[in-house]
Amino acid sequence: MGIGMDSSTMSGPLVAHSGILDGDYEKRPAVCKMQMRFDLANVGLRVLSLACSLVALVSMASNQESGVVTVFGFKLPVYSKWSYSDSFEFLVGASAAAAAHSLLQLLLCGMKMVKRASTIPSRNHAWLLFAGDQVFAYGMLAAASAAAGVTNLNRTGFRHSDLPNFCKPLHRFCDKAAISIVFAFISSLILGGSAVLDVFWLSKN
């Protein structure tokens, strides 16, 4: 007497997971395609986040300039440096931390893809990534907002005198600060996108 068994009704440890957790690409080509798209999106966001964080970091950490301004007929030397502002120091620190986070996750993703495994091996890992991406996203947003909202740059940026418009004699300093702030905002958005991608993965597993 033959006994028939419907594999679709089976449950337990012998049944393959229906989500995208498993990295067994050869046996499940449909899952492979979806998994590959997710992994490429994950790696792409990590690369962009790393690049933007590094631009924000380098632009600000190398930002200093000296010049001469004329006040009431007197020429006064002025000098500005990023470390004179607490907000700029915060931005440098946040950018360095975000860059380190992005680099670490990028390396881990690369190692997983070389082994043809999912870049997120478990739900616990996904939750950890989600928390980390959120922390760094809000950190970069706060740092960029603080740097953009600085109103007391005359005191922190000048050694010799208070001037109402220090960007006129030190335009290069202001331009580099603006570049750093813009890329910090972009990095924050990208890290937020990574957090959304983490949620997508969790919803599928």
Swiss-Prot record:
Residues 1-39, 111-125, 198-205 are cytoplasmic. NCBIfam families: A_tha_TIGR01569. Pfam families: CASP_dom. Signal peptide: none annotated. Keywords: Cell membrane, Glycoprotein, Membrane, Transmembrane, Transmembrane helix. The chain crosses the membrane at residues 40-60, 90-110, 126-146, 177-197. It comes from the Eukaryota. This is CASP-like protein 3A1. It is a multi-pass membrane protein. Residues 61-89, 147-176 are extracellular. It is found in: Cell membrane. GO terms for cellular component: plasma membrane. InterPro entries: CASP/CASPL (IPR006459), CASP_dom (IPR006702). Its main location: membrane. Glycans are attached at N154. Belongs to the Casparian strip membrane proteins (CASP) family. Homodimer and heterodimers.
